[in-house]
């Protein structure tokens, strides 16, 4: 979102000076503005956030479709040729070296799992607002399956187009807009990308930890306080993003995060479908007494935590093989 604001400022001739933690003054102003706007939006409550998301989603689709058409018009037949190279596992398509298109598939699959692993754990924070189960199923069908397939098609076309037009793979949508060099598209795209990324931050990075912190210490932390704590932590991480985190690389960072959180989702699924046989005592879920059914041992399910540590260690090791013992390290390294 801050990159979108920086793009807008740059379009009007505002250039940054100086540098701190890898960001110039324009980027810092944009980052602080976006952080403040997110806190304001969060403070207004779930209803305003829902209305904001209903605007942000269609807006980014409009921009991406226009961007795809613009790049396709410039690329001509070269776009489809580059898309074919991506599917054939060409040199510029990414993925795991030496595995061709299957390697590219594995790379995309791991990124998708890493991304959704963080979101799906807190699915209940939003699913509880639906009117009935049928609405939830429709939302999952169109939001996860339909949306991901259609948006992936758009991004695939744009990716192939950037290679054909600019001779290089352009990863950031804001960079693509800047290269197209259309003032109207730049203005609309900046606002749309700003809205979309703020909306994603609300759903994936803001509301879930706010609920989690409030549930962790309900007598001392309410929902809003949890949101402020989250905002402070997010500001620190965001401030270090360019100078520290990006040095790790986007894919390793997302995959590491997914490797830590994905086992939690797996444990939840096994616990519900296999161990508890799809039966939950809802009233007992809110019973914090030591004799409660779900209090376990001191409030912690030690078996679940051991399962998470073991599976998480192996999952993180698939991203960083050097932390694993010989045999496993060689397997994931190769």
What spans do the regions from the language model cover?
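Hydrophobic alpha-helical segments and their helix-loop junctions in multi-pass secondary transporters
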Residues: 2-14, 59-92, 115, 155-164, ...
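Hydrophobic transmembrane alpha-helices that form the core helical bundles
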Residues: 1-18, 199-214
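Membrane-water interface regions at transmembrane-helix termini and the short interhelical loops
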Residues: 12-13, 33-56, 71-75, 122-132, ...
């Amino acid at each position: 979102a801050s990159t979108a604001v920086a793009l807008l400022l740059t379009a009007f001739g505002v250039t940054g000076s100086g540098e701190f933690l890898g960001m110039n003054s324009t980027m810092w102003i944009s980052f602080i503005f976006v952080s403040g706007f997110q806190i304001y939006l969060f403070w207004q409550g779930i209803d305003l956030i829902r209305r904001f998301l209903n605007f942000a989603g269609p807006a980014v689709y409009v921009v991406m479709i226009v961007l795809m058409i613009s790049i396709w018009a410039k690329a001509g037949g070269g776009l489809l040729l580059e898309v074919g190279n991506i599917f054939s596992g060409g040199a510029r398509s990414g993925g795991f070296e030496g595995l061709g298109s299957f390697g590219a598939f594995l790379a995309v699959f791991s990124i998708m799992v890493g991304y959704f692993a963080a979101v799906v754990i807190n699915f209940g924070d939003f699913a509880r607002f639906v009117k009935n189960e049928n609405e939830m199923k429709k939302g999952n069908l169109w939001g996860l399956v339909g949306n991901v397939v259609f948006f992936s098609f758009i991004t695939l076309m744009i990716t192939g187009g950037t290679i054909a037009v600019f001779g290089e793979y352009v990863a950031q949508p804001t960079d693509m807009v800047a290269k197209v060099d259309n003032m109207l598209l730049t203005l609309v795209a900046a606002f749309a990308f700003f809205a979309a990324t703020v909306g994603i931050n609300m759903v994936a990075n803001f509301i879930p930890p706010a609920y989690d912190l409030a549930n962790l210490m309900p007598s001392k932390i309410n929902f809003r306080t949890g949101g402020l704590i989250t905002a402070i932590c997010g500001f620190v991480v965001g401030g270090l993003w360019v100078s520290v985190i990006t040095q790790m690389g986007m894919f390793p960072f997302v995959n590491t995060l997914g490797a830590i959180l994905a086992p939690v989702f797996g444990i939840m699924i096994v616990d519900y479908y296999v161990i508890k046989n799809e039966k939950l005592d809802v009233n007992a879920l809110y019973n914090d007494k030591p004799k409660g059914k779900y209090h376990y041992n001191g409030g912690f399910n030690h078996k679940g935590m051991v399962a998470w540590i073991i599976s998480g260690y192996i999952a993180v090791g698939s991203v960083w093989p050097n932390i694993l013992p010989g045999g496993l390290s060689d397997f994931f390294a190769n």
